[in-house]
Amino acid sequence: MSKELSYDLVVVGGGPAGSSAAFAAAKKGIKVALIEKENCIAETVRTSGVTWIQNIKEFGIPDDCYNPIKNFSFCSPNNEVTISDSEARAAVLDVRKTYRWLATQAENEGVDIFVKTNINNVIKNNNGDIIGVKGT
């Protein structure tokens, strides 16, 4: 059975870029669908990272999405640099939780999120512009 839906914008991929794009568009009143092939947002995240708490706060990321650190080291085969401070200025992100938070922010702005959906074809007009997608 085929189902046709209509959106102003379809974002394929529910990672941080896709979720952020969907969120930003929805805030401007655009009707957005966010398509993710996995069973849920951030299901197969294989990354982590350290970033500055100031930047985390600027993006509004909740406290439960990161773990503050006061000491950390950068290591290479030939060198190691350790940074220590009495105040936590950096943090390790819980990337999976952060990506899911981003998607939730998009959803709260009215974005429709479709998981377990693979896009297998694009629909083009006579000029070659992409005007739609087909998925399963």
Name each model feature, range by range.
Residues S2, C65-N67:
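Short solvent-exposed loop/turn micro-motifs enriched in small/polar/acidic residues
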